Amino acid sequence: MANSKKQAWFFYTTGLPSDIEIEVDDITFHLHKFPLMSKSKKLHQLITEQEQSKVYSHIKLENFPGGSEIFEMVIKISYGFKVDISVSTAVPLRCAAEYLEMTEEYSPENLISKTEKFLSEFVFTNVQESIKALKACESVSSLAESLCITEQCIDSIVFQASSTDPSSFYGWPINNGGIFTVDRKKQSKDSKTELWFEDLTELSFPIFRRVILSMKSSVLSPEIVERSLLTYAKKHIPGISRSSSASSSSSSSSTTIASENQQRELLETITSDLPLTATTTRSLFGLLRAAIILNASENCRKFLEKKIGSNLEKATLDDLLIPSYSYLNETLYDIDLVERLLRRFLENVAVSSSSLTVVGRLIDGVLGEIASDANLKPEQFYNLAVLLPVQARVYDDGLYRAVDIYFKTHSWILEEEKEKICSVMDCRKLTVEGCTHAAQNERLPLRAVVQVLFLEQLQLRQVITGTLLTEEDGDKTVVDLGRWKEAVKENQVLRLDMDTMRTRVNQLEKECLYLKKVIAKIDKESLLKAKHGAGKWSIGKKFGCKFSAQVCDSQEATMVDRRSRRFLS
């Protein structure tokens, strides 16, 4: 039955029956008075009081530190048996010795002095052992606090952590969730103490935060504080990792997962405790994803967005592709978040040109990934593309690729919307390959194609002119042979492109002339029918066809003029 009491019998001297019963946690220990009274002042007083009142010797110890297991160890020590003290039992044994008043004054080499010696020699000299002892303090928190054991453990952790080299963190791999993981194969014997970051995750959050606050108040490097926080967050907030590995899933199965409210509170507290510097961008993205999933406070999300935005050049394309967790967003990825992060980055007046270029390539990569989203509206694509300053893009090939994918996926958008999106591109920044592709791209609006063709012709003339120019020093002309060969090769490529362009324009002219003849014929037939009362308006006017001979004629003249000028040159 649940109420029945278990009994533990201890007869360490043959033939001597027990003369006292002590109850701890519903377990009755049948013991002997003499060894207990010789070591414990409190038990001596309790046994003496019962003997004077002539009551059967049965003592119940309420709220005994460490419970029946620790009391059993105390009994063995009192009887003179050898007991191996470990880090996990040293703290509750010290508290139990205080509870039973097993002082040095009462009996030499008593339990208090033994446990204090063990703590000072084997626990407070090692950071990992101090963390284990601090974990043991949680079960005897009140006595551990009054004896200052908890404070001593925290001070020991902070002191020992100060000897850890923060630069060793940067060589460690990072998993998909954005949190550091330990590469144990690469660790040397001298770096084994760095595993204490994982040990910190076993602490309860109130105790862990006391450690963090103590770290921040000391001269400890921000990298160590950051790593401690992020490792703890990964262990207790599953949403930080984008994909769980086998190791993380196995470890999470043994860890009790907190409720959503507890995770949210934990995340907000960890975020507020992050150092102002030295936080890795990828780790922050993991926290930001968790903040969105857990619907953390606005201040928490703004803080993370500000920290990420200030170091956006350190992010990767995978970091920025955060799924839309809100049902209000129709797009696959959170485009508004990317736009806010970019604005945060541009607010920094100290942005270098190299960082701006890196972010430019990053945003063009994002545009290329989101362009295939059927729910992405033209204004959303345009707003993100136009937000980058002109100097952020050295070449516009990445932007052109994104625009081409968007037009291919969204063939239904209006011509005006296409022209607006193409206005972000600078055709002068397209490479030769980009210009060649754009000149033959039927998805681009006509205005964009004309701009590309015009710039191709301009570039061709500039290359030819620049190649033929030589330095005139009065004596002789010096021509760089290597540069000449390169220019000739590029000239040949451009000539082929011009031939392709000319063929396409000729086809367009033929189609225009053919359509003009067909429409003229239809209008002529309509006029004849109108005279006989068959209709009043011509089909050309009815359908709004406004093809004029002047348009095609002017284009023909222009092309003839271009050809003549080219052959003359």
UniProtKB/Swiss-Prot annotation:
Keywords: Phosphoprotein, Ubl conjugation pathway
PROSITE patterns: BTB (PS50097), NPH3 (PS51649)
InterPro entries: BTB/POZ_dom, NPH3/RPT2-like, NPH3_dom, SKP1/BTB/POZ_sf
NPH3 domain ranges (all copies): 194-459
Domain of life: Eukaryota
Stretch list, region Disordered: 240-261
The BTB domain, residue ranges: 18-87
Biased composition (Low complexity): 240-259
Pathway: Protein modification; protein ubiquitination
SMART domains found in the cross-reference section: BTB
GO BP: protein ubiquitination
PTM-bearing positions, type Phosphotyrosine: 400
Free-text comment about domains: The BTB/POZ domain mediates the interaction with some component of ubiquitin ligase complexes.
Function text: May act as a substrate-specific adapter of an E3 ubiquitin-protein ligase complex (CUL3-RBX1-BTB) which mediates the ubiquitination and subsequent proteasomal degradation of target proteins.
Family, as annotated: Belongs to the NPH3 family.
Protein name, as recorded: BTB/POZ domain-containing protein At3g50840
